[in-house]
């Protein structure tokens, strides 16, 4: 490690790829953000063009593109981890419901409940991050919401929509 220090060599672990780095960049994961409940357009994966050749799912994909999305994949920041007993709690990211500041469950017109799909630290942004689908009317940077975790409400804020909380222009990746 010492020999590569001047080249920026540093230790990394699987958590960078599986959680923290993925969440900071807003990358979706099969089985968490990418699941049958949401189509590719809603997941923010629509491409500018659709190839002319036929492919499995093309008809459904074109139908979803035409309908547009009523939800967006968002990155949320946890504003406080302290529960009512003064204990810090860190969400694990698995179906915690997202509520309005009035305590109302958030659902879309299909009855899908907004929930946390992934949670983890975002060391590059200095915040604990969550990924979640939100109806477009709430998918606005700066919107304050709450997450129910262990029967406690924790304040969260929308930080990014269909993008990343860290390096949204991908300038670091592009060099």
How should these model regions be labeled?
Residues 1-175:
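Conserved, structured C-terminal
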